[in-house]
């Protein structure tokens, strides 16, 4: 799908490339800022990636480590928590490869003087029920306000938040850290902070309360019905992402424009019991051709069977230095 910044660009007026003055103002007033790197932060990284692209070393764990950490270390972080994903929707699909990457990242970052840990999280199914740009922003706001919270997203989000409290030495006890993260989410503070951040970075002051009126919607929506009754056995997460790209919600080439309105919502999780014809998901498209292609892609990505499958926990392992 689109990148994180493409999703935030769905918000009218929001700037993902603020100057240092606005960046500092946002952090001071809101407490956080979701922004992109500037051209002068680890500028050599883009050159190295260009070389990797033509030398078949894009998947080199050592060079991936250098690329990821160059930006983090250059920013001068006091501590760092990494979410290293594995599974059919992750860059490193194989668990052992992902674990090797996580261990390398943690070892190098700690060696450079930044207190770092990593959580390994499962992407053998979508983390949330939405995939796209504006639809994911809506999903995130609904998550923050409590209008709708996908269970796997809640587990991973709270685990990462708690880990950050521990690694930054704000809270020594992991159980207490998790409780504090839970209170911030369910007490509404997280939604308030997000709303302040959006406003300081140029978005609407009432975005959290009225996000539905600000986010662009695709002109066509259609449900994808289950072809038979049964439990969801597996989901090809990468195929769902590719379907969003084909809708226009991601880039095939760097110069491609992103359609923020398109995407897929209502994605049923692994283990869900469905009747024949019950919606597996809803496709939001710009035209009929893209709509039908995405509906087929979603059907092809899902496997149903009579027996309920074993489900996995979303946070598989914690990697420490």
Tell what function each PLM region has.
Residues 1-3, 33-46, 75-85, 116-119:
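Core alpha/beta catalytic barrel or barrel-like domain that forms the active/cofactor pocket
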Residues 19-29, 42, 211-215:
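Short linear loop/turn motifs
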